[in-house]
Amino acid sequence: MSKSLQKPTILNVETVARSRLFTVESVDLEFSNGVRRVYERMRPTNREAVMIVPIVDDHLILIREYAVGTESYELGFSKGLIDPGESVYEAANRELKEEVGFGANDLTFLKKLSMAPSYFSSKMNIVVAQDLYPESLEGDEPEPLPQVRWPLAHMMDLLEDPDFNEARNVSALFLVREWLKGQGRV
């Protein structure tokens, strides 16, 4: 953060709506110039998530998973919450086993992303998984997740697939491409 910027003062935080999964807060702010505003946000949970980009035999492994927000099956990388006490790498390996049926001997952290930071505090850790071995764990998915193997040589063609459009997946694709370029693999 720029040292010349002063964060606004939080004057009040109030819960304005609650459901089984979400809590919406109203946040009264005063900026350093004296201007006051009321914003709304999802209550911070202080839990992060992980997105895993598995690579095997020069292919990416993606899954198709139902997204109720878009009411469609989305093509993307495996992801899930980091459980309390888990490291990013432990969560990545667990989610990979639950959703893809593989574990990884080689996990590489690429970047931590935020999504809609004006409304959410959540962070997504992007991890590449390599040197895979078959291993499954029971997950919390309501149905099996079909896998799609996509050749690394054509990875950017994913951008043309109408089911591959979620922003974190697109970001992960670009991050992985740059990481692979740095290794001389694409």
From Swiss-Prot:
<dbReference type="GO" id="GO:0006753">
    <property type="term" value="P:nucleoside phosphate metabolic process"/>
</dbReference>
<comment type="subunit">
    <text>Homodimer.</text>
</comment>
<keyword id="KW-0460">Magnesium</keyword>
<feature type="short sequence motif" description="Nudix box">
    <location>
        <begin position="80"/>
        <end position="101"/>
    </location>
</feature>
<dbReference type="GO" id="GO:0042803">
    <property type="term" value="F:protein homodimerization activity"/>
</dbReference>
<dbReference type="InterPro" id="IPR020084">
    <property type="entry name" value="NUDIX_hydrolase_CS"/>
</dbReference>
<dbReference type="GO" id="GO:0047631">
    <property type="term" value="F:ADP-ribose diphosphatase activity"/>
</dbReference>
<dbReference type="InterPro" id="IPR000086">
    <property type="entry name" value="NUDIX_hydrolase_dom"/>
</dbReference>
<feature type="binding site">
    <location>
        <position position="99"/>
    </location>
    <ligand>
        <name>a divalent metal cation</name>
    </ligand>
</feature>
<keyword id="KW-0479">Metal-binding</keyword>
<keyword id="KW-0378">Hydrolase</keyword>
<feature type="binding site">
    <location>
        <position position="40"/>
    </location>
    <ligand>
        <name>substrate</name>
    </ligand>
</feature>
<dbReference type="GO" id="GO:0005829">
    <property type="term" value="C:cytosol"/>
</dbReference>
<feature type="binding site">
    <location>
        <position position="118"/>
    </location>
    <ligand>
        <name>substrate</name>
    </ligand>
</feature>
<dbReference type="GO" id="GO:0000287">
    <property type="term" value="F:magnesium ion binding"/>
</dbReference>
<dbReference type="InterPro" id="IPR015797">
    <property type="entry name" value="NUDIX_hydrolase-like_dom_sf"/>
</dbReference>
<feature type="binding site">
    <location>
        <position position="95"/>
    </location>
    <ligand>
        <name>a divalent metal cation</name>
    </ligand>
</feature>
<comment type="similarity">
    <text>Belongs to the Nudix hydrolase family.</text>
</comment>
<comment type="function">
    <text>Active on adenosine(5')triphospho(5')adenosine (Ap3A), ADP-ribose, NADH, adenosine(5')diphospho(5')adenosine (Ap2A).</text>
</comment>
<protein>
    <recommendedName>
        <fullName>ADP compounds hydrolase NudE</fullName>
        <ecNumber>3.6.1.-</ecNumber>
    </recommendedName>
</protein>
<dbReference type="GO" id="GO:0019144">
    <property type="term" value="F:ADP-sugar diphosphatase activity"/>
</dbReference>
<dbReference type="Pfam" id="PF00293">
    <property type="entry name" value="NUDIX"/>
</dbReference>
<dbReference type="GO" id="GO:0019693">
    <property type="term" value="P:ribose phosphate metabolic process"/>
</dbReference>
<feature type="domain" description="Nudix hydrolase">
    <location>
        <begin position="45"/>
        <end position="172"/>
    </location>
</feature>
